[in-house]
Amino acid sequence: MRKKSSSNKEETALHPPPENFETATAELEQIVAGMETGQMSLEDALSAYKRGVELLQYCQNILKNSQQQIKILEADMLKHFSPAEHDAS
């Protein structure tokens, strides 16, 4: 029986973090396409699923941080639009 801790270390070494959001989404699309073929062994499918979860979490984190940055940047620039104000101009 394999030790869990060494297995986790091996998977981390095999799957480095993605370079950026676009790289992560491209890899995720490849994983999904590979799994949809139905040609993967159960072990390979499970490994691919785990990597997919890692990539999804990475992408969600990037999107969340980006949304927060946009809200901060737009905080002073956003004004409520009123058609009456626009027509008066």
From Swiss-Prot:
One of its GO terms (molecular function) is exodeoxyribonuclease VII activity. Keywords: Cytoplasm, Exonuclease, Hydrolase, Nuclease. Disulfide bonds: none annotated. It catalyses: Exonucleolytic cleavage in either 5'- to 3'- or 3'- to 5'-direction to yield nucleoside 5'-phosphates. InterPro entries: Exonuc_VII_S, Exonuc_VII_ssu_sf. One of its GO terms (cellular component) is cytosol. Its EC number is 3.1.11.6. GO terms for biological process: DNA catabolic process. Pfam families: Exonuc_VII_S. Transmembrane segments: none annotated. The keyword Cytoplasm applies. Residues 1-22 are annotated as: Disordered. It is an enzyme of class 3 (hydrolase). It is found in: Cytoplasm. Bidirectionally degrades single-stranded DNA into large acid-insoluble oligonucleotides, which are then degraded further into small acid-soluble oligonucleotides. Belongs to the XseB family. Heterooligomer composed of large and small subunits. This is Exodeoxyribonuclease 7 small subunit. The gene is xseB.
